[in-house]
């Protein structure tokens, strides 16, 4: 054990975070012999730095002889779309045919199914994107004018905005925040605000230019809609028709031209709100609430007393009687509404804030009521018709006349048709709204449902025939009340079963039929029998005389 180690403090008594050791080795020249080198271990205690000082020191984490520098850089710039002309290898003045030819060549060369090169798929995708851009006339014109920035989805640039327009409308704009401010905040803060409309209002309207200062918002007065109802027949709904509808909409006053003022009169500033359009109310607790001025309606201007137009009473609009011809297309259903744009009421411009306020008439809505038809019923574009057929036609088959939208047609009835059986006549139904679909008929179908008419009362002849039919069909459950001789149907001797039964049954059916139809024997047969009897009597008398 080294004697000096007893004088050393224990390492555990000093915190490890501030304990540093150093080892010094010394060599002595060998004079009289070899002397072992002695090693000395020294402990150095570093002063503890305060946390505040370490925070102020920018290098307290790691002390070194060099200064550590940290560089700040902007976010990586998004790569712009490649030049489509260079991708396809054509000039900017190339025709559509040259562009198409170049694209087909690249597509054939770099198609992933034929070219297994790892980079072929990427080149094929670039060629597709380039051709899609250059094949569209508008997209190509936009690219030639603005470059790749016009198609940057993250740039928010709209090349069609123009001067005074909304450059943030393209590429999504502010719509990424949940459809305006309302989508980004719980509770629906201003959920109905459209940021593009808001920007357009502050910009003074998109695509509008002009000198002079404009207001921050452009007011548009929209008139009320008019709703009317008209009745049409089932056939008119199927074929389409036109109707004249009388309405009484509001129109611009011809006397004041919509100003609501007399000739030479002007609006004056509202004294209640001093032209601001709002009035501030002081509430309890020092709160202030701003509300729309009830005197001017928020316009800030009022019409002086006695300056109103005598025709429209200051509203700027008057009612007129008008006839509108409405074209009702074929295929409309009961309860549908047709909208005729711009045929509603004109807005009351006499109450507008400024004489030059933009206006827009309302719309006319026509509700269609279709009267029911006695013969047909409807299911969408299909027509349903119930055809009543006799019992004999249902059993034996035949043809019946079925009415359609274009007249009557003959329909074959299969043998054994029962109640509820249907047949479909394709393309003979209602017209389908929305245009003709490819591969499908523009009209619906006519579905005919058969109903067998069962007789409630039978004559004696009809019942006799049916009872005979029941006997022929072996129906033992049918009720029989007619007195029909059935001796021919009785069992015959076994020896005569083959031929005798047939002749007897045939004779029975004939006799039953003659009895049913009240057939009498022919007159010739009776005369012949009488003459034969007379001859027999005469011959017998002659024989007696001879005796």
From Swiss-Prot:
SUPFAM superfamilies: Chaperone J-domain, DnaJ/Hsp40 cysteine-rich domain, HSP40/DnaJ peptide-binding domain
Ranges for the CXXCXGXG motif repeats: 253-260, 270-277, 293-300, 309-316
A GO CC annotation given for this chain: mitochondrion
First and last residues of the transit peptide: 1-79
Localization of this protein: Mitochondrion
Family annotation (InterPro entries): DnaJ (IPR012724), DnaJ_C (IPR002939), DnaJ_domain (IPR001623), DnaJ_domain_CS (IPR018253), HSP40/DnaJ_pept-bd (IPR008971), HSP_DnaJ_Cys-rich_dom (IPR001305), HSP_DnaJ_Cys-rich_dom_sf (IPR036410), J_dom_sf (IPR036869)
Annotated segments matching region Disordered: 484-547
Keywords for the protein's UniProt record, in alphabetical order: Chaperone, Metal-binding, Mitochondrion, Repeat, Transit peptide, Zinc, Zinc-finger
Molecular functions (GO terms): ATP binding; heat shock protein binding; unfolded protein binding; zinc ion binding
Zinc finger (CR-type): 240-321
Residues in coiled coil: none
GO biological process: chaperone cofactor-dependent protein refolding; protein refolding; response to heat
Keyword Transmembrane helix: no
Compositionally biased region (Basic residues): 512-522
Domain annotation J: ranges: 83-147
HAMAP family hit by this protein: DnaJ
This protein's name: DnaJ homolog 1, mitochondrial
Species whose genome carries this gene: Emericella nidulans (strain FGSC A4 / ATCC 38163 / CBS 112.46 / NRRL 194 / M139) (Aspergillus nidulans)
